[in-house]
UniProtKB/Swiss-Prot annotation:
Has antimicrobial activity. InterPro entries: Beta_defensin_dom. Keywords: Antibiotic, Antimicrobial, Defensin, Disulfide bond, Secreted, Signal. It comes from Gorilla gorilla gorilla (Western lowland gorilla). It comes from the Eukaryota. This is Beta-defensin 104A. Coiled coil: none annotated.
Length: 72
């Protein structure tokens, strides 16, 4: 009887849909500290690779006017 209860408990635990990824893994830093892990990159971001949790590694786009600035 104990084995039956134990098998039932184990099967119920295995039947539950356990989360594979936690929400804490979202917004992790990737890309040598310059980008973020996201499910989908935002419109102002480039996808530069994949994070260890298989999300996209998203780098924010640069403003062209900031890159071509010269001091007067």
């Amino acid at each position: 009887m104990r084995r039956l209860v134990l098998l039932l408990a184990i099967s119920l635990l295995l039947y539950q849909d356990l989360p594979v990824r936690s929400e804490f893994e979202l917004d992790r830093i990737c890309g040598y500290g310059t980008a973020r892990c996201r499910k989908k990159c935002r419109s102002q971001e480039y996808r530069i690779g994949r994070c260890p949790n298989t999300f996209a590694c998203c780098l924010r786009k640069w403003d062209e006017s900031l890159l071509n600035r010269t001091k007067p």
